[in-house]
Amino acid sequence: MRLHVLCLVFAAMIFAGCETMTGYSPGAGGYDSVPDGEKAQATFSGGDGSSIQQAVIIADATEKTGVRAEYIWLHERYPGYRLRFQGLRHEAGRVYDEMRIVAADGKSHTIFFDITPFFGKLR
Protein backbone atom coordinates (compact mmCIF):
# COMPACT_ATOMS: atom_id res chain seq x y z
CA MET A 1 0.00 0.00 0.00
CA ARG A 2 2.80 2.43 0.88
CA LEU A 3 4.49 1.79 -2.48
CA HIS A 4 1.20 2.46 -4.28
CA VAL A 5 0.80 5.77 -2.44
CA LEU A 6 4.43 6.69 -3.15
CA CYS A 7 3.92 6.01 -6.85
CA LEU A 8 0.80 8.16 -6.94
CA VAL A 9 2.59 11.01 -5.17
CA PHE A 10 5.55 10.74 -7.55
CA ALA A 11 3.25 10.77 -10.58
CA ALA A 12 1.32 13.76 -9.22
CA MET A 13 4.55 15.68 -8.73
CA ILE A 14 5.62 14.93 -12.28
CA PHE A 15 2.23 16.03 -13.64
CA ALA A 16 2.42 19.23 -11.62
CA GLY A 17 5.94 19.89 -12.83
CA CYS A 18 7.33 20.02 -9.34
CA GLU A 19 10.78 21.54 -9.70
CA THR A 20 11.88 20.59 -6.19
CA MET A 21 11.47 16.87 -6.92
CA THR A 22 12.74 16.52 -10.46
CA GLY A 23 14.60 19.74 -11.13
CA TYR A 24 12.59 20.08 -14.33
CA SER A 25 9.13 20.87 -15.50
CA PRO A 26 7.98 20.65 -19.12
CA GLY A 27 7.30 23.88 -20.94
CA ALA A 28 3.90 25.54 -20.86
CA GLY A 29 1.28 23.23 -22.31
CA GLY A 30 3.70 20.30 -22.23
CA TYR A 31 5.77 21.63 -25.13
CA ASP A 32 9.43 20.63 -25.51
CA SER A 33 11.53 23.25 -23.74
CA VAL A 34 14.92 21.48 -23.58
CA PRO A 35 17.62 23.66 -25.14
CA ASP A 36 19.54 22.17 -28.08
CA GLY A 37 22.84 20.65 -27.02
CA GLU A 38 21.95 19.97 -23.38
CA LYS A 39 23.64 16.75 -22.25
CA ALA A 40 22.00 14.21 -19.96
CA GLN A 41 23.64 13.41 -16.64
CA ALA A 42 22.74 9.75 -17.11
CA THR A 43 23.41 6.86 -19.46
CA PHE A 44 20.96 5.35 -21.94
CA SER A 45 20.75 1.73 -23.03
CA GLY A 46 18.07 -0.74 -24.04
CA GLY A 47 15.77 -0.23 -26.98
CA ASP A 48 14.00 2.57 -28.80
CA GLY A 49 11.26 2.99 -26.18
CA SER A 50 8.46 1.82 -28.46
CA SER A 51 7.26 -0.80 -25.95
CA ILE A 52 8.01 -1.98 -22.43
CA GLN A 53 10.12 -4.75 -23.96
CA GLN A 54 12.07 -2.09 -25.90
CA ALA A 55 12.17 0.47 -23.08
CA VAL A 56 14.97 3.01 -22.89
CA ILE A 57 16.93 2.16 -19.73
CA ILE A 58 18.18 5.19 -17.82
CA ALA A 59 21.06 4.48 -15.44
CA ASP A 60 23.75 6.33 -13.50
CA ALA A 61 21.18 8.88 -12.37
CA THR A 62 19.24 10.19 -9.40
CA GLU A 63 15.54 10.99 -9.69
CA LYS A 64 16.45 14.59 -10.50
CA THR A 65 18.95 13.81 -13.25
CA GLY A 66 17.03 10.75 -14.46
CA VAL A 67 13.76 12.58 -15.03
CA ARG A 68 15.64 15.38 -16.79
CA ALA A 69 17.37 12.73 -18.94
CA GLU A 70 13.97 11.47 -20.13
CA TYR A 71 13.10 14.90 -21.50
CA ILE A 72 16.53 15.31 -23.07
CA TRP A 73 16.17 11.91 -24.79
CA LEU A 74 12.75 12.93 -26.13
CA HIS A 75 14.09 16.30 -27.31
CA GLU A 76 16.98 14.67 -29.18
CA ARG A 77 14.65 12.29 -31.05
CA TYR A 78 11.44 14.33 -31.29
CA PRO A 79 12.41 18.02 -31.27
CA GLY A 80 9.37 20.21 -30.75
CA TYR A 81 7.27 17.39 -29.26
CA ARG A 82 4.33 17.99 -26.94
CA LEU A 83 3.86 15.85 -23.82
CA ARG A 84 0.27 14.61 -23.56
CA PHE A 85 0.58 12.09 -20.70
CA GLN A 86 3.16 10.80 -18.26
CA GLY A 87 2.58 7.98 -15.80
CA LEU A 88 4.26 5.18 -13.89
CA ARG A 89 3.86 1.48 -14.66
CA HIS A 90 5.08 -1.45 -12.61
CA GLU A 91 5.68 -4.72 -14.45
CA ALA A 92 7.75 -7.79 -13.56
CA GLY A 93 9.43 -6.03 -10.65
CA ARG A 94 10.55 -3.04 -12.73
CA VAL A 95 9.35 0.58 -12.83
CA TYR A 96 8.58 2.29 -16.13
CA ASP A 97 7.71 5.84 -17.03
CA GLU A 98 5.19 5.87 -19.89
CA MET A 99 5.19 9.10 -21.88
CA ARG A 100 2.70 9.84 -24.63
CA ILE A 101 3.78 12.61 -26.94
CA VAL A 102 2.77 14.26 -30.18
CA ALA A 103 5.79 14.90 -32.40
CA ALA A 104 6.24 18.13 -34.34
CA ASP A 105 4.97 16.31 -37.46
CA GLY A 106 1.67 15.57 -35.68
CA LYS A 107 2.30 11.84 -35.16
CA SER A 108 1.54 10.34 -31.75
CA HIS A 109 4.09 8.16 -29.96
CA THR A 110 4.16 6.27 -26.68
CA ILE A 111 7.66 6.00 -25.22
CA PHE A 112 8.66 3.78 -22.29
CA PHE A 113 11.61 4.49 -20.01
CA ASP A 114 12.86 1.87 -17.56
CA ILE A 115 13.54 4.03 -14.50
CA THR A 116 14.16 1.16 -12.08
CA PRO A 117 17.87 2.06 -11.66
CA PHE A 118 17.07 5.51 -10.23
CA PHE A 119 13.46 5.31 -9.01
CA GLY A 120 13.33 6.45 -5.38
CA LYS A 121 16.95 7.66 -5.32
CA LEU A 122 16.74 11.34 -4.50
CA ARG A 123 20.51 11.84 -4.25
Where are each of the predicted segments found?
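Intrinsically disordered, low-complexity boundary segments flanking structured domains
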Residues: 42-45, 68-73, 97-100
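C-terminal motif of bacterial Sec signal peptides marking the signal peptidase cleavage site
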Residues: 14-17
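Bacterial signal peptide processing site
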Residues: 19-21
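Short, compact, well-ordered microdomains
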Residues: 87-123
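Bacterial N-terminal signal peptides that target proteins for export
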Residues: 1-7
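Short, non-transmembrane alpha-helical segments in secretory-pathway proteins
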Residues: 50-84
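Post-signal peptide N-terminal segment of mature Sec-exported envelope proteins
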Residues: 26-48
